[in-house]
Amino acid sequence: MKIKHYPGKAVDASLSLEGSSAMGALYEANWLRAANQPAAPATTGTKLSRQSSSAGSSFLIEGISALSKYQMTLENIRQLELQSRDKRIASTIKELSGYRPSALQHHQQQQMHNVWVAEDQDQEHEELEDASEGKEKLASIQEPPAVNHYVLDPTERPRVPRPRQQFSVKPPSLRRSQTMSQPPSYATLRSPPKIKENLSKSSSAYSTFSSAAEDSQDQVVICQQPQRLMAPPPREPPPEPPKRVSKPLSRSQTSVQRYATVRMPNQTTSFSRSVVRSRDSTASQRRLSLEQAIEGLKLEGEKAVRQKSPQISPAASSNGSSKDLNGEGFCIPRPRLIVPVHTYARRRRTGNLKEQSSGGQEEEAEKGKGWKDFYVLSQDRHSSFYINRIGQNYDYDYPINFNIFSPDGRVEVSREGKYLSTLSGAKVLGELAILYNCQRTATITAITECNLWAIERQCFQTIMMRTGLIRQAEYSDFLKSVPIFKDLAEDTLIKISDVLEETHYQRGDYIVRQGARGDTFFIISKGKVRVTIKQQDTQEEKFIRMLGKGDFFGEKALQGDDLRTANIICESADGVSCLVIDRETFNQLISNLDEIKHRYDDEGAMERRKINEEFRDINLTDLRVIATLGVGGFGRVELVQTNGDSSRSFALKQMKKSQIVETRQQQHIMSEKEIMGEANCQFIVKLFKTFKDKKYLYMLMESCLGGELWTILRDKGNFDDSTTRFYTACVVEAFDYLHSRNIIYRDLKPENLLLNERGYVKLVDFGFAKKLQTGRKTWTFCGTPEYVAPEVILNRGHDISADYWSLGVLMFELLTGTPPFTGSDPMRTYNIILKGIDAIEFPRNITRNASNLIKKLCRDNPAERLGYQRGGISEIQKHKWFDGFYWWGLQNCTLEPPIKPAVKSVVDTTNFDDYPPDPEGPPPDDVTGWDKDF
């Protein structure tokens, strides 16, 4: 989608229009006319008579656009010009919140403007009577004559000539965010007279505006420099002059279309001149269609000067929308706010970074979030960036492209009114927009004419998701055709497909040479290869056969036989592409994982039934609140006890239903309840029972009064090797339990690790946990920026391997006190993550074995991460860094923890911060019924 933005200062939330905007001048003129000259409002359309019958009749209905009070469409603006004495305009504009045209501040200095001025009637009649003489005169000033003539409607008010004013070539002083450049789509003259060489005269500017779609005849279209109009004093209408009939010029007087650009000091003013050589009598045959115009743009897009000027077809004009000379839709000038403001603090924000408003619905092909009927500046979010028309919301990433009229397209970056930098050329703006929804960090203002190529977030993510799924399915089908792979499980095939690397060979290249040693296996994905064998007696290569797409070779190398028995030569003229996997990677992935996956199948079933039986009769009214343990995104966590039992306490998590619905987190809440309700692991916080009412959802959970691991890390600065090893081992055990059930956690960080009274760590907050189908991936962008894996950022799909990445990040943070990937804002953090763990300098206090484990966990390729390979998570437990660690004692909770928190009683909350009561009060009721199964 190609979006055209026009230069000018960024518009604030009150929609005060700048003087460099032609539409701003129109608003101002209409506002002043309506306020000073009351008249009866028109309720019917005004018919514009034309000479040509092929053009048809055009009706413009007066009124204000109902789609938004902040802008009027071009057709309505033109109607207001025809019905200039409409009292309702003033009252309508006054209703706009905070709207006051900036020209009401009567500036003493009038901005420079270029308008075509009508000559004396006698001169024009003289010119039209003598066509050949007119042609010579026009040629002398290098300006083509008009072809779009018509008979004036007697019901129309004639234009009142105004005193001509000279303008200086020197433009007024410009601020950094202003420009004097203007694209050729703001104004068109309906009845242009003879054109003088002197362009420094003014007339009743903007009172003769007309759209290309309304003028069905060929026309001279002129690009004017927008100006700030000063309101003329009220005057009596003069008597109507006699009707004037313009004579059409002959074909011999027309010239070929061309563009010209006039450069002035400190500004760029483009004038578009076009005259079509007519070869047919009908207007439809003389005009280029919109499709031809677009095709012409594609062919001529790289040229500095275009050779043809496309016109708009009648079909296009029938839609009621105006088109400019470039074949693009006429757009009312819009704000150019592009980039977001991200609230960033050490208390890291975790969330569904893909779409805060949607709650990250985990469907693999999420639909758009709809649109809201308000102007973009009232919300200033990426998810509601105004692009095409009022009422549509898009999520865009903006690379700047060069403009044919302005090769030096530039934008200005500012924050809170302070200038930061100027960008030009092939720069990218709004990178975060295609990842997730967040507030803008800066203001981007077009200071020259720019062409922007935009991509919508949902479109980008859908393309990435579908491309990944198609590639995965294609690679899996290739593997199933190989005898040594056909009996492997589906998830194993998917793992192998993830590590296949595509390599390319040119015609004549030897992919494999007979007698050479190799450990790689090949699958042909494109092209053909020739198989030959060198005969020992003649040393000549004997042709064996041809192999094509889907065929494979080198399979014996995976089984240990590394001596090549034939030559494989690229035969296709376009080259050959092969999918390659080496023996080491293959052996790491291929194993019998059934024992690991089913280790916990029958464990804890009896204990879960016992818990359900014990808490079956407990009601919400049986609980009394002792203190507040924490405050979350949807509510609070309270320390509670049951009536009549002071020997134990629980954590009651209460979540506001209305806020859950507002942020569309229903699916995540239901998933959290399901996963925690089925879990029975001593390294995961237990869920005992759930409640609900009209306002809240409640989760009665195990209380961990030792506090957050983050609090201890903050106080100590960092942990030593032994302490880090213990807490990492607790997380490994929790991941072992979850991953054996194909559950991905996706929110690991010290803030989500709670210590119980003994000092053992437990995972809490399963809001982003998800149960995956075997061998499948998910595409939701969620988590904490410092812990997000590269495949999540790149939208390639992720699975449990993303948890192993975050485990390596956690190890680094526990050993040093800070995560390895940290930037001043999320985008900088993501860029550091994409550079990889090898670009990170490890402090000296990290031992060699710890560094080795972190780097193996944080591999860029998910399939190469330790824990995701052949031995599963046991490969982590067997790593040298864990040598001598008492895993059996940890699993049975007999191992002494390195830090034992001070907990005096079951209601001791000294390890938690103090929290005030909820200042917002009770939320509104929610009776939609989405939580019936909670």
Curated annotation (Swiss-Prot):
It catalyses: L-seryl-[protein] + ATP = O-phospho-L-seryl-[protein] + ADP + H(+); L-threonyl-[protein] + ATP = O-phospho-L-threonyl-[protein] + ADP + H(+). Residues 623-882 form the Protein kinase domain. This is cGMP-dependent protein kinase, isozyme 2 forms cD5/T2. Residues 883-934 form the AGC-kinase C-terminal domain. Its EC number is 2.7.11.12. It comes from Drosophila melanogaster (Fruit fly). The gene is for. Residues 175-185, 218-227, 249-258, 308-324 have a biased composition (Polar residues). Residues 121-287, 301-327, 910-934 are annotated as: Disordered. Residues 121-131 have a biased composition (Acidic residues).
